[in-house]
């Protein structure tokens, strides 16, 4: 018995293997049902929209209407939908779209802060300090230093009795100040500066041994060295050294006259010619101090004053007869002892420092304000 052919052998498509449905016509005859072939042409969009879109179950439902397309933005709108802020009369709010596609109003932006002023730095620190004042000229600074040194020197020698009672500490301080002044000498050629060198100079301190006898007399009781001076005449090339010693009874003055020759811009050679003794000036009245200091002991002079009171008339007559006498002049022999040299190491309008024969002389010009400190 022959086997029937397999079901799938003659069928070219699986759909052909299914039994063919039949459609009963009104005449009672049956005719085969054929599936309509799918058209290769797509239906119009309107027809597809009218027929609906099949869902996953094959049912068709009307599709949601698509929103109308928005027209292109005008040329004055940017890509974010914001109006041109420069357009006049634009009062509607500016809308923006966030990341979820929802419209919103942008947050107001704070205005940027103004640039800091020019005197503040970028870290907000203190303003830069003003520029320093212009430097003081070096000449002014040196002049102020000299004036201060001169005042210190006069204060140091005050009360030393021209150096006779100066202690070792005072002498050392004086030498230090003198050295500093000599280093800042404003007159490098003092002998040539005749307008400064000429005049009467008052001695305020000395370390010259030959003046010690005179200073010792001034340190004795009832005696005082009033003044030791040196007058320089650059026209006649002469020097006059004068000293005055006073007491309650009389005052005594003597001097020595010398000529000088210029040896260098700062050194002169002195040749003494004669000595002169002025007549003593007798006091018309004797005024003794209440007490004197002799070797550390105070001695009262009251009894001596009582003895001298009856003699006041006699002193007055003696003073009148002597005051008219000429000075006594004595020549000084021209030997080596009458010669000396004088080196001026500092000179200005007020102060002169000289060295000679191993001695130191500090002199202030007559009329200088420095004398008011003594």
From Swiss-Prot:
GO terms for cellular component? chloroplast
What span is annotated as transit peptide?
1-46
Q: Where is this chain's protein located in or outside the cell? A: Plastid, Chloroplast
Going by the UniProt record, its keywords in alphabetical order are:
Chloroplast, Plastid, Transit peptide
Q: Which residues fall in a compositionally biased region of kind Low complexity? A: 28-54
Establish whether keyword Transit peptide is in the entry.
yes
Q: Kindly indicate where the leader peptide sits in this chain.
A: none
Question: Which Pfam families does the entry mention?
Answer: PAP_fibrillin (PF04755)
Transmembrane regions: none
Location of the region described as Disordered in the Swiss-Prot/TrEMBL record? 19-148
- Pro residues bias (residue ranges): 64-73, 127-136
InterPro entries annotated for this entry?
A: PAP, PAP/fibrillin_dom
Belongs to which family? Answer: Belongs to the PAP/fibrillin family.
Q: What is this protein called?
A: Probable plastid-lipid-associated protein 3, chloroplastic
The organism is Oryza sativa subsp. japonica
**Upper lineage:** Eukaryota, Viridiplantae, Streptophyta, Embryophyta, Tracheophyta
């Amino acid at each position: 018995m022959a086997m029937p052919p397999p079901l799938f052998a003659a069928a070219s498509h699986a759909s052909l293997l299914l039994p063919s449905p039949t459609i009963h016509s009104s005449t009672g005859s049956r005719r085969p049902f054929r599936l309509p072939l799918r058209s290769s042409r797509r239906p119009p969009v309107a027809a597809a929209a009218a027929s609906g879109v099949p869902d996953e179950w094959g049912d068709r439902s009307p599709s949601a209407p698509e929103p109308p397309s928005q027209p292109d933005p005008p040329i004055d709108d940017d890509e974010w939908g914001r109006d041109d802020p420069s357009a006049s009369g634009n009062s509607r709010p500016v809308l923006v779209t966030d990341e979820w596609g929802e419209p919103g109003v942008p947050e107001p932006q704070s205005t940027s802060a103004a640039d800091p002023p020019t005197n503040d730095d970028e870290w907000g620190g203190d303003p830069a300090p003003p520029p320093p004042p212009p430097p003081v000229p070096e000449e002014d600074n040196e002049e102020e230093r000299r004036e201060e040194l001169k005042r210190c020197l006069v204060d140091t020698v005050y009360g030393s009795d021209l150096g006779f009672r100066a202690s070792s500490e005072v002498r050392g301080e004086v030498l230090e100040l003198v050295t500093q002044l000599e280093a800042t000498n404003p007159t490098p050629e003092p002998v040539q500066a005749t307008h400064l060198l000429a005049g009467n100079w008052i001695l305020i301190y000395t370390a010259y041994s030959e003046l010690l006898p005179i200073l010792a007399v001034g340190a004795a009781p009832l005696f005082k060295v009033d003044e030791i001076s040196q007058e320089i005449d650059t026209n006649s090339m002469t020097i006059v050294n004068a000293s005055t010693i006073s007491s309650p009874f009389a005052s005594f003055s003597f001097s020595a006259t010398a000529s000088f020759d210029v040896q260098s811009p700062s050194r002169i050679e002195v040749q003494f010619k004669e000595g002169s003794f002025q007549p003593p000036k007798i006091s018309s009245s004797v005024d003794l101090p209440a007490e004197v200091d002799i070797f550390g002991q105070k001695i009262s002079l009251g009894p001596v004053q009582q003895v001298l009171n009856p003699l006041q008339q006699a002193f007055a007559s003696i003073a009148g007869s002597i005051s008219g006498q000429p000075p006594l002049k004595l020549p000084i022999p021209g030997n080596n002892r009458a010669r000396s040299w004088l080196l001026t190491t500092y000179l200005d309008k007020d102060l002169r420092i000289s060295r000679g024969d191993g001695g130191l002389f500090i002199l202030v010009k007559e009329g200088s304000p420095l004398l008011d400190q003594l």
